Amino acid sequence: MGQSSALMKTKREFVLIVATMLAIPVLVASCHARIHELTDPVDKGKVPVTISVNSLSGYSYAQTRAMVDVGEVCSNLSFCIYPCDGESFDKIQINQTREDPSFGTVSQNLTVGVHKIVVVAHNGDKNATMTNSESISFGSNTVLKTTDTFCWAGEVNVTQETGTVNVALTRATAMFRLNLTDSAIPAQVCELQFAYKGGSAAVNPFTLEGTTKSNQKESFVIQDHSRKVFEVYTFPRYEEKNGERNLSPLEITVTAIDIYGNAVKERVLENVSVNRNRITECTGEFFAGGCLEYTNIGFGGLQVEEDWAGTDNYTLPD
């Protein structure tokens, strides 16, 4: 850029447009930071760029298709563009819900230079907190905290040229599934609570790893007492010990609550392994012996079966 005040007044801009359409990819859809040059000359001082969020990768646990449209899976999108080095303006965050007529399409003018761009799709009831590009977190108005979440992050070198950036979001979460074999949930139970630690409620979209050591909680109101399946999510987190870097296991406390708020049944699942894009499934009779009983359960080996990337199965002991 020139140094004169006239040239400073004609600072080049970059137009960011996110559109759900197929286009020739000029950007590798990954969650690792890369710098991408975009190449069709346009009018001086303007840099229009189209970013197309056209699919999610890794979505195979409920369907056989490996790639699906973002609107089929997630109800919320957040796009965040971060300033170039030395710029004083704050990040620009644009949030959308599936109900928005323009879901998947946004426009924004930006300056020439290298910008970090992060895209997050999720099913939470609040927008993602994206102040730190390397630690995205989620709040909650109710009990929906960590939901199935997909990310893309990269660096785009905005020049006097234009092009299309195709974005395929990648799953960042692991799922824990409790599969009950009880004939029915006891009538006095009105809520099932999952309190778990060892995972993370925040994620680095560049590495897809959890960034915080979190205590997480999810609650399910029991309206159908024949319900068998309960699912919660976390961002797997690594810990270093004795020079080795290993995934942190979860400790999960599952508590049945009655209408008066009393805990009438509780089980503690210890040392539960979770991995990104995998389901860890625990199957068994949760209410064996009736209510008002507390049991600690330890888990050992894993059995793996392909479902997401795979399912790790445990049997709930009597």
Predicted features and spans:
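Structured interaction patches on ligand/partner-binding surfaces of diverse proteins
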Residues: 33, 95-99, 124-164, 260-290
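Primarily secretory-pathway and cell-envelope proteins
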Residues: 31-77, 128-190, 194-196
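Bacterial Sec-dependent N-terminal signal peptides
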Residues: 25-59, 178, 277, 282, ...
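Tryptophan-paired
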Residues: 71-131, 188-278, 310-318
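Generic recognition of cysteine residues
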Residues: 31, 74, 80, 84, ...
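Sec-dependent bacterial lipoprotein signal peptides
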Residues: 1-30
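Compositionally biased regions
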Residues: 5-6, 31, 136, 141, ...
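A structural detector for beta-sheet-dominated domains
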Residues: 52-54, 82, 95, 111, ...
